[in-house]
């Protein structure tokens, strides 16, 4: 891959985002090509958010939520896992490698684990090469902002 893969990380506010923050506070090294979006719960991440990320041309997507059984919203991370599995199936059907999408569970105290996960997902994406939909990094950056805006509207609207 001539360019570093662009990874979009959908993170739960209470656990994964806090772990990412801890990784930064601990000055742990992980690839800087990961864009983190904070959600109140991974259960608020809709299939269309994940598909929109791939449509933009990101090379990989990770969803990171609370440990199973530890969701602040009870079953949000379980709903997210089902959505991730459905989107992986859709990706395969449209010719995009399903391994470009993965869900991870971690606690807010696992800053080092967050850094490891980012390295793991980047290492998984590099051999796949850039997304066949990737053509303009500026478009991706602007699109990430739009996904964040749409996600905020979804959350405020109270869907699912």
Task: State where each predicted segment sits.
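Iron-sulfur-associated redox domains of electron-transfer enzymes in respiratory
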Residues: 1-160
């Amino acid at each position: 891959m001539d360019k570093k893969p662009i990874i979009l990380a959908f993170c739960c506010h209470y656990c994964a985002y806090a772990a990412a923050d801890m990784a930064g506070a601990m000055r742990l090294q992980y690839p800087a090509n990961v864009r983190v979006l904070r959600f109140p719960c991974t259960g608020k991440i809709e299939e269309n958010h994940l598909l929109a990320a791939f449509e933009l041309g990101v090379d990989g997507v990770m969803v990171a939520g609370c440990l199973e059984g530890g969701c602040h919203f009870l079953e949000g991370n379980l709903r997210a896992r089902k959505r991730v599995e459905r989107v992986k199936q859709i990706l395969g059907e449209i010719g995009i490698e399903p391994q470009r999408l993965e869900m991870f569970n971690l606690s807010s105290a696992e800053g080092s684990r967050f850094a490891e996960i980012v390295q793991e997902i980047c290492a998984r994406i590099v051999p796949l090469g850039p997304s066949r939909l990737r053509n303009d990094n500026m478009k991706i950056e602007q699109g990430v902002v739009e996904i964040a805006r749409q996600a905020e509207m979804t959350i405020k609207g109270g869907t699912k």
